[in-house]
């Protein structure tokens, strides 16, 4: 069935390209017109005016300015290309909503370089990595959300720094610390950016390196060796690296007791999420540049991960693509600010196919209570 639907969508994409004169009114999201249904591959004067209008709205909403007219014109061309890309993404991911985001003036290459930072190349688990025990799954709830339990801090923003790995690791440790102490504390990502240079000795180019990328398990290993993490307010995030480490052991508020890798079985992922708190995971972010909301369940998605995020929950019936029965989904906290996605969150379908590689690199961490001296 999925293959039939996929080929139907490919045909629809080609047909849409041939019906360039068809214009459907846009959708409105938080007062901002989503023009994805007004964009066609070939521009006429009216469509060009629409693109210029939406580019003006885009610049206003996201406070975008460009140093020169040449740069402005280049970004407008990129913006138009991303409108067409969002329209194609909508056809191939119909249960989500795709359109204009804060990244709509970036090429895919620029987007990956500036906002994705997972060091995934050649990834394999170290031989001494602890594996999470198999948990019972017969009594799993159909829906669960750690936000409702008070275990998740507000959405943060990594800025133009490839430090997603640090936000993923910190989010998991914030949740683990909450489970251990019943206290929700915002911890310091900047401590990891500045101070964590942990490496997997079995792999070249596997060291955590601030805005140039890292791995969540390396970050947990660093936290174990360093003794713990400081509060965000004591070591605030700047989104810059190559600065001196300002770690103060006297201000540690959360420490790692252990961490482990979770099985790629989705029931085991759900069981570990419910029992051990939010999980640090990796995902392929190719569909996230144009994502606005809904449940993303694309018919094609690479399983090569390039982005670290935080798994905080799951739902039972979030979408019904092509009139099929409603399907379950995962709830993911991202680190691109609350203006992206569903107030900073991403929903992606659950199932046996390792959607966008999200089942491959999943870690759980446990915390111990540490009082400031």
Swiss-Prot record:
InterPro entries in the record: Papain-like_cys_pep_sf, Pept_asp_AS, Pept_cys_AS, Peptidase_C1A, Peptidase_C1A_C, Peptidase_C1A_papain-like, Prot_inhib_I29
GO MF entry, a single one: cysteine-type peptidase activity
Positions of the catalytic residues: 164, 307, 334
Propeptide: 21-139
Inducing or repressing factors: By drought stress.
Pfam families: Inhibitor_I29, Peptidase_C1
Signal peptide: 1-20
Protein localization: Lytic vacuole
Top-level EC class: hydrolase
EC number(s) given by UniProt: 3.4.22.-
BP GO terms, sorted: proteolysis
Chief localization: other
Alphabetically ordered keywords of this record: Disulfide bond, Glycoprotein, Hydrolase, Protease, Signal, Thiol protease, Vacuole, Zymogen
Residues modified by glycosylation: 258
Cysteines engaged in disulfide bonds, as pairs: 161-211, 195-245, 301-356
GO cellular component, one term: lytic vacuole
Gene3D superfamilies: Cysteine proteinases (3.90.70.10)
Purpose of the protein: Probable thiol protease.
The family this protein is said to belong to: Belongs to the peptidase C1 family.
Listed name of the protein: Probable cysteine protease RD19C
Gene: RD19C
């Amino acid at each position: 069935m999925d293959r039939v639907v996929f080929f139907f969508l490919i045909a629809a994409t080609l047909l849409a390209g041939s019906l360039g004169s068809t214009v459907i009114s846009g959708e409105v999201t938080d007062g901002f017109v989503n023009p994805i249904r007004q964009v066609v591959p070939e521009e006429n004067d009216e469509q060009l005016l629409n693109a210029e209008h939406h580019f003006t709205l885009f610049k206003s909403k996201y406070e975008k300015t460009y140093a020169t007219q040449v740069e402005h014109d280049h970004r407008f061309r990129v913006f138009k290309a991303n409108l067409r890309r969002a329209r194609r993404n909508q056809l191939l991911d119909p249960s989500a909503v795709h359109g204009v985001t804060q990244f709509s003036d970036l090429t895919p290459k620029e987007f990956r370089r500036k906002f994705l930072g997972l060091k995934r190349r050649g990834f394999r688990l170290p031989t001494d990595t602890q594996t999470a025990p198999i948990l019972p799954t017969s009594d799993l709830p159909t829906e669960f959300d750690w936000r409702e339990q008070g275990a998740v801090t507000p959405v943060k923003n990594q800025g133009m720094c490839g430090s997603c790995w640090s936000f993923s690791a910190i989010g998991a440790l914030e949740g683990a610390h909450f489970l251990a102490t019943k206290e929700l504390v915002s911890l310091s990502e900047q401590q990891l950016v500045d101070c964590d240079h942990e490496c997997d000795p079995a792999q070249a180019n596997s060291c955590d390196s601030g805005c140039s990328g890292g791995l969540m398990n390396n970050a947990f290993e660093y936290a174990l060796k360093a003794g713990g993490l400081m509060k965000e307010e004591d070591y605030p995030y700047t989104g810059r690296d190559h600065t001196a480490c300002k770690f103060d052991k006297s201000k540690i508020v959360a420490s790692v007791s252990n961490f482990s890798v979770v099985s790629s079985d989705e029931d085991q992922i759900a069981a570990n999420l419910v029992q051990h708190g939010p999980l640090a995971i990796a995902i392929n972010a190719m569909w996230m540049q144009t994502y606005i909301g809904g449940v993303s369940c694309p018919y094609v998605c690479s399983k090569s991960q390039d982005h670290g995020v935080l798994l905080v929950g799951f739902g039972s019936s979030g979408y019904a693509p092509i009139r099929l029965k409603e399907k379950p989904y995962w709830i993911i906290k991202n680190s691109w600010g609350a203006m992206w996605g569903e107030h900073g969150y991403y929903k992606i379908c659950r199932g046996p196919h390792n959607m966008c590689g999200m089942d491959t690199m999943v870690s759980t961490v446990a915390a111990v209570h540490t009082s400031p001296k």
